[in-house]
Amino acid sequence: MVESELSYEQIRLNRVEENKKRMGELNLNKLAQSLRVSSSSSSSSKPSPAKPRTMRIPVDFSEVRRSSRAKGPPPSYKEFGLEPLERRPRRSSRRRDLLNRVYASDDARMYAFDRAEKLQSSLDSEYASFTKPMLQSHVTGGFWLGLPLPFCKAHMPKRDVIMTLVDEEEEESQAKYLAQKNGLSGGWRGFAIDHQLVDGDAVVFHLIARTTFKVYIIRVNDDANNDSDGNEVNDDDSDGNEEDRDNDNESNEKQKETVSEGRQLRSSGKRKRRGRK
């Protein structure tokens, strides 16, 4: 046992010596000393001074004014008595007032159209012409007048142009012709209003130049152009009106008698009630 322990100790010592030699060969001792010196120097060195903290500027969250004018006084939220609001009167539009529109009867419309065709037949056939009966959408109720398609294809320009409308008094007006839509647009409504066109009127357009229409207006309510047949009818109507007046007078007298009898009965009934009381 003693010999074994000595041999083990001897082996350990031999190993330690070998390790020291190797460390010497590798200069590990010097490296360890240099590390110790560096660590001691770093611990003994003075710490670097801390950088001074800069003061932060407080942020202003108020609204930035970009106007050069002086700022007005702050708003006041005090409660004051409110004055009653005045309602503005509504502006009545003649164009939208459908109740005031007057529509021509079929007989009057056909009568005006027949007179317009007679006038058209008397015009110079060298220049093209057509007759157009007026509707509400053609006059005050709208701003557009469609022209006959065959007439437009045969005689009207192929592009948009400004047409001149010359009335019977040689007064000129301007209206824009739209080639793709075959009608008059800008300026037609003003012409219709200025010449007081209404539903049922018949208008004759005579193309006296490439961009000029001579316009003849036949009024639906023009009594001066009525024929003699109309006068005879009026005479017959006058006789019938006299008979109607006589009948009305008799009926009025009967109504007066019945009213007077009713008043007498009421007065007698009131007297009886007073006597009972």
UniProtKB/Swiss-Prot annotation:
A cellular component term, taken from the record's GO annotations: nucleus
Annotated region described as Disordered, given as residue ranges: 33-94, 224-277
InterPro entries: B3_DNA-bd, DNA-bd_pseudobarrel_sf, REM16-like
PANTHER family linked to this entry: B3 DOMAIN-CONTAINING PROTEIN OS06G0194400, B3 DOMAIN-CONTAINING PROTEIN OS11G0197600-RELATED
Acidic residues: compositionally biased ranges: 224-250
Gene3D superfamilies (UniProt xref): DNA-binding pseudobarrel domain
DNA-binding region(s) from the entry: 130-221
Protein's recorded name: B3 domain-containing protein At3g19184
PROSITE patterns documented for this protein: B3
GO molecular function: DNA binding
Subcellular location: Nucleus
Ranges of Basic and acidic residues composition bias in the record: 251-264
Originating organism: Arabidopsis thaliana (Mouse-ear cress)
Keywords: DNA-binding, Nucleus, Transcription, Transcription regulation
Domain of life: Eukaryota
Record has Coiled coil as a keyword: no
Biased composition (Basic residues): 268-277
